[in-house]
Amino acid sequence: MRHGVSYRKFSRPTAHRMAMMMNLAVSLVTSERIVTTLPKAKDLRSVVEGLITIAKRYSQKDPVCGRRLLLSRTSGNSSVTNKLLGVLAQRYKNRNGGYTRIMKNGFRKGDCAPIAIIELVDREKDLKVIGS
């Protein structure tokens, strides 16, 4: 029975699954929009929202501790940590969760897997379209 299990295994060992999720999270934070399969997007949402919440929490009260925590969570990627603490923490300071949007995008041609676009809400490109 799988009572209380809140993640998918993706037919991968634990270390591979965690590395895959962190690589997807780094890609999403840097480009703010990626295309992946629907189950991966649904699991990625909780990872990215956790990173943004950590950045919001620590950006004002203890930035050094927050930077160290985010560096350990993002495999030492300093550009992603800087973007989380600088840009994204300020962008979402008045939003309590719900930082990502998942849109279904049909099926993959080879194996008919459901494809989704996951993106950060209130992106700069979205704001330019609304403002013009």
UniProtKB/Swiss-Prot annotation:
SUPFAM superfamilies named in the record: Prokaryotic ribosomal protein L17
Sorted UniProt keywords: Ribonucleoprotein, Ribosomal protein
Pfam families: Ribosomal_L17
Keyword Ribonucleoprotein: yes
GO MF annotation list: structural constituent of ribosome
InterPro entries: Ribosomal_bL17, Ribosomal_bL17_CS, Ribosomal_bL17_sf
Single GO biological process annotation from the record: translation
One GO cellular component term: cytosolic large ribosomal subunit
Self-association state and partner proteins as the record states: Part of the 50S ribosomal subunit. Contacts protein L32.
HAMAP family per record: Ribosomal_bL17 (MF_01368)
Family note: Belongs to the bacterial ribosomal protein bL17 family.
Name of the protein: Large ribosomal subunit protein bL17
Lineage per the UniProt record: Bacteria, Pseudomonadati, Pseudomonadota, Alphaproteobacteria, Rickettsiales
Gene this protein is translated from: rplQ
